[in-house]
């Protein structure tokens, strides 16, 4: 295996600090409309306080972060507001970090290793599943969430053999008596009990949380470090993401722990009751597929760092006489197989959109000429309990003439992160996190973002 994440050590911070966070009044106006929508869900007896959960938003245009701000309440009981330092559960947005860890450890050739190299006790089908299949959701492994439900429905004795109560507990949430909580170790046991796969690996894309739990375990076995420690040392700390952490089996937090001082609570919108806090689930203890917690300012730093990778990749992609550099990190943006034609492609923890289009531009002589452009976007949703999140990144650039490199002046990019702590968005598609992100993007790129990059399907499929 190659040395891990050496290039990350050269990156310090995200290009801004908490004392200089920018704000855009147009986004403020949009988010005020969003908060009014949430307040409309309050019953009459709760409207006096006006307290509603909310969201945190970060926007980057080019290499400049133009907006980082929180809206609404992080905790309805205390009235604490959402700020750039408020911590959210990222849900499946966590997958991009797990994938990035794996791509920092393994070479392209090593991504072809069968997972049986790391899981000796797995059935024979593990010889046919490669590490890259876990990353790209082409392993054919059944989702452990489904296996968990099936186990609960089976004979209690069999279930108890697989699942034993651990000692961990989830931050800020009361533990329920007689709860049977699933951990990564239990997921491995559930997978090992599946004697056959429903289909062959690498045939189809099929979203599976199981693969990312296994990927977290592979990172641990390959580096002798838990995913939490590896990411902290090689990603979070070098990038200044000081409030971001993985909640794993070593996490025995208490309410006054530093990691939880600014942690939001999440709320379901219940008719007649307003917003009801949600927190406990016996599935709160698995990680790799989720369970990374972060702030909007930390996520802005992460997006800002990825922009440096974008620029290097795009500007070199069409350079004359230059071979495309092949490394594991480039697989971040490499698509796997599609499940069906209406689905966007998937890379390493990101859904992918690619497009080519024509546009009229002003030439040096002042005339308008038609040029061909390319666009590329990556996005992912993250939903868990009442946490609903969205991250999207987009680039566009003019294709150069044959034999010419890409002109950096034609390259534009944008990044948007939306973190929310409520489910009141779901009935109203206008304020669903991905739809909200599209509205924000239109403030900067007009209808281009929606017409050429976001195709309207991604909200349903991410």
Mark where each language-model region is.
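Short, solvent-exposed turn/loop segments enriched in Gly/Ser/Thr/Pro and often Arg
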Residues: 61, 65, 115, 122, ...
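Short active-site loop at a secondary-structure junction
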Residues: 48-56, 77-134, 197-211, 287-290, ...
């Amino acid at each position: 295996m190659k040395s891990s994440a050496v290039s990350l050590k050269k990156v310090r911070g995200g290009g801004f600090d908490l004392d200089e966070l920018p704000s855009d009044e147009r986004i403020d106006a949009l988010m005020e409309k969003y908060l009014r929508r949430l307040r409309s869900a309050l019953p009459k007896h709760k409207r006096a306080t006006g307290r509603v959960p909310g969201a945190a938003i970060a926007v980057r245009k080019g290499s400049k972060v133009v907006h980082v701000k929180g809206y609404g309440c992080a905790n309805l009981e205390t009235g604490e507001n959402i700020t750039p330092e408020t911590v959210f559960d990222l849900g499946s947005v966590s997958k991009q970090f797990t994938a990035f860890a794996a791509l920092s450890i393994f070479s392209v050739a090593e991504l072809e290793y069968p997972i049986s190299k790391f899981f000796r006790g797995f059935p024979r089908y593990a010889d046919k599943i490669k590490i890259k299949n876990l990353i790209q959701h082409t392993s054919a492994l059944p989702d452990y969430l489904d296996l968990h439900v099936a186990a609960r429905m089976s004979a209690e004795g069999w279930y108890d053999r697989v699942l034993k109560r651990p000692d961990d507990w989830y931050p800020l949430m009361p533990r329920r008596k007689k709860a049977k909580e699933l951990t990564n170790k239990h997921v491995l046991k559930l997978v090992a009990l599946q004697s056959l796969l429903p289909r062959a690996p690498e045939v189809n894309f099929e979203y599976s949380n199981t693969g990312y739990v296994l990927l977290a375990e592979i990172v641990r076995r390959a580096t002798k470090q838990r995913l939490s420690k590896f990411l902290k040392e090689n990603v979070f700390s070098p990038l200044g993401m000081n409030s971001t952490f993985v909640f794993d089996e070593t996490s025995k937090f208490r309410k006054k722990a530093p990691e939880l001082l600014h942690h939001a609570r999440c709320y379901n919108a219940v008719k007649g009751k307003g917003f009801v806090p949600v927190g406990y689930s016996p599935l709160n203890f698995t990680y790799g597929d989720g369970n990374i917690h972060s702030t909007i300012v930390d996520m802005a730093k992460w997006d800002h760092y990825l922009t440096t990778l974008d620029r290097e990749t795009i500007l070199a992609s069409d350079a004359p006489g230059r071979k495309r550099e092949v490394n594991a990190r480039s697989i971040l943006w490499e698509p796997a197989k599609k499940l069906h034609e209406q689905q966007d492609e998937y890379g390493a923890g990101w859904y992918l959109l690619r497009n080519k289009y024509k546009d009229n531009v002003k030439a040096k002589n002042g005339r308008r000429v038609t040029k061909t452009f390319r666009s590329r976007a990556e996005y992912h949703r993250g939903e868990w309990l009442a946490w609903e999140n969205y991250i999207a990144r987009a680039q566009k650039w003019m294709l150069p003439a044959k034999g010419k490199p890409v002109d950096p002046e034609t390259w534009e990019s944008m990044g948007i992160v939306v973190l929310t702590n409520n489910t009141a968005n779901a009935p109203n598609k206008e304020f669903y996190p991905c739809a909200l992100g599209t509205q924000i993007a239109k403030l900067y790129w007009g209808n281009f973002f929606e017409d050429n990059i976001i195709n309207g399907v991604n909200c349903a499929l991410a």
